[in-house]
Amino acid sequence: MKKQHDTIIVLDFGSQYNQLIARRIREFGVYSELHPHTITAEEIKAMNPKGIIFSGGPNSVYGEGALHCDEKIFELGLPIFGICYGMQLMTQHFGGKVERANHREYGKAVLKVENESKLYANLPEEQVVWMSHGDLVTGLPEGFVVDATSESCPIAGMSNEGENLYGVQFHPEVRHSEHGNDLIKNFVFGVCGCSEGWNMENFIEVELEKIRETVGDKKVLCALSGGVDSSVVAVLIHKAIGDQLTCIFVDHGLLRKDEAEGVMKTFSEGFHMNVIKVDAQERFMNKLKGVEDPEQKRKIIGNEFIYVFDDEASKLQGMDFLAQGTLYTDIVESGTATAQTIKSHHNVGGLPEDMQFKLIEPLNTLFKDEVRVLGSELGIPDEIVWRQPFPGPGLGIRVLGEITEEKLEIVRESDAILREEIIKAGLDREVWQYFTALPGMRSVGVMGDERTYDYTVGIRAVTSIDGMTADWARIPWDVLEKISVRIVNEVKHVNRIVYDITSKPPATIEWE
């Protein structure tokens, strides 16, 4: 990335939220990069950042395997902001006291600002924040003062303003912290003195150059699904290298209703790209027969997907690279070197060791909302840019347990009804992601005066900015009623509809 803008470095101590910190900073027009906690002070100095943020993490600073950083980082003279574990690490380094809390604090808490340091400038004295910690600071290091408290956390915020050192026990990067964005903004601009200067135009310029340098005169295969991510990847790479790109669209039989036809029409006819369609439904279904475990399903689908590409590439000449639409959120949900794994992702797990391609993942530093902005900048039509997020394993992870043709058809038809009614109600931009899932359970019902014993369909709809955290969508009851009535009446073997009202965390958006 060209250094024509200020940069904030985020050190990764294993928090599942660490990518969010960088995302929040980018929202302000300031570039931010995430780096492992093992990075050296010299390496940071060479990057010339304006400030450093220590992320949270699942460890205890006194526990076995506790993560630490190069202590010379504290001697660089840069502003440092420690979040949760990062605050505890800072406390330990400067001689303060960290202890195990009586009860792990998880969820919303009311924060009371006791000292208006630069971090809390122009913020209310009381605010709701998101806590997620098992340890807490019980003794301040020398030179530090208490900035904020909560009912369960006497030192919820601290600072040494003379040294530009700040710490908070809560997570300002999570949307549940109502003034978290403003607090991070105060650090970035008020403490570090950053100026806005990073935007999507910069990203496009740098990525096009990077793709051309990486690929040279070689050829690239793109895993095109018609979803937002792969569409943006295809258009970006096509813009960089033109006809050196060949798109392969694999119809694995796990797509939404009418999706395969739509993909071919849009990209082959509309964008004039070289798109090869592979009909592989039977191949995938044979591999998935009898498989119930979700991780195994993801791995099988991921492996088979790449093997199909291998087969197709062998028919083509000189294909060296495989392009994928891996996002920042994909990587964090699959676990980084320090993050605890939640679930494997199809773009970052399940790749065979003997894969014959080198990977190109031009979106792997972007979040979903940034990808949409990028798509618009590249001139991709709104109907594609604003398409629903759809996982690579497709409906394979929306049918819980073993996948059968009957179950796929139920999900495919019910999902089409849900999408149609959400669009009719004008909620398609308001609701970030919505889909149906089949939990595999049957229940007793009565239809036409006869007893039935049929499937239950689950509806999942969430509001979110970037997929890292999400709230369940408050869809109007009359809209939910229409959806429910239509699915039960129009989709065979369904007699009950349930609505998922769980936020993320603790649940993930997808059910598998």
UniProtKB/Swiss-Prot annotation:
InterPro entries: Class_I_gatase-like, GATASE, GMP_synth_C, GMP_synth_GATase, GMP_synthase, GMPS_ATP_PPase_dom, NAD/GMP_synthase, Rossmann-like_a/b/a_fold. Residues 7-197 form the Glutamine amidotransferase type-1 domain. It holds the Pfam family NAD_synthase. Its EC number is 6.3.5.2. SUPFAM superfamilies: Adenine nucleotide alpha hydrolases-like (SSF52402), Class I glutamine amidotransferase-like (SSF52317), GMP synthetase C-terminal dimerisation domain (SSF54810). One of its GO terms (molecular function) is GMP synthase activity. The active site is at residues 84, 171, 173. ATP binds at residues 225-231. CDD domains: GATase1_GMP_Synthase (cd01742), GMP_synthase_C (cd01997). Pathway: Purine metabolism; GMP biosynthesis; GMP from XMP (L-Gln route): step 1/1. It catalyses: XMP + L-glutamine + ATP + H2O = GMP + L-glutamate + AMP + diphosphate + 2 H(+). Coiled coil: none annotated. Signal peptide: none annotated. Residues 198-387 form the GMPS ATP-PPase domain. It is an enzyme of class 6 (ligase). Keywords: ATP-binding, Glutamine amidotransferase, GMP biosynthesis, Ligase, Nucleotide-binding, Purine biosynthesis. It comes from the Bacteria. Homodimer. Catalyzes the synthesis of GMP from XMP. This is GMP synthase [glutamine-hydrolyzing]. It comes from Bacillus mycoides (strain KBAB4) (Bacillus weihenstephanensis).
